[in-house]
C-alpha cells in the first residue's frame, strides 16, 4: 500500500499521484487536485480523509473509493469514479456542476447539499452507478442534470429540484425511493423500471414533467 500523511494542505494541481499496483491511502488538511490533477489507484482502492477536497477539472479514480471530506467536495468539470466497486463519500456540500460522479457498484453519499445543476440542457452534472443511495440534510439540485442507476435509486433530501433533469433507475427488481420535503419535476423525467416506486414527498410540482413506472410492483405516492 502507498500511504501519505500531511498535516496541512496537499497541492496536486496539474500533478499526478499514481499507485499502479497497490492501494492509495491519503490524509491531509485539504487536497487540491484541480487543473488537470490526477489521483489514480489502477488496481486497488483509494481512501481519502481531508478537509476540503477540490477535484475541479481533475481526475480521481480507483477500483473503489472511500472519501471523507469534512469541508466539502468540489468536482466542477471533474471526474470521480470507482471503476470496479463502490464509491462511498461522507462530506458537507458536494458540488458536481458539469462534473461526472460514477461507480461500478454502490454510490453512497452522506452530506449536506448535492449540486448537480446546469444553466441549460446538457450542462448539468452526470451521475451513474450500479446502485445509488444519497442521504442529504439539505437540497439535491439536479436542474438539467442526470442521475442514473443500473439497479436501485434511493434519494433522501430536504428538497429535490429535478426541473429539466432526469432521475432514472433501470433495474427490474428492488425499488426507487425518494423522500423529500418537496420534488420539483417541472419538465423533468423520473423513470423507474424497479419493481416498486415509492415517493414520500411534502409537495410535488410536475408541470410539463413525466413520472413513469414500468415495474410490476407498487407505485406509491404520499404528498
Regions inferred by a protein language model and the residue ranges of each:
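Short, T/G/N/S-enriched strand-turn elements that build extracellular solenoid repeat scaffolds
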Residues: 13-18, 33-40, 53-61, 75-81, ...
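Surface-exposed loop/turn motifs in large extracellular/passenger domains
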Residues: 1-7, 18-29, 41-51, 61-71, ...
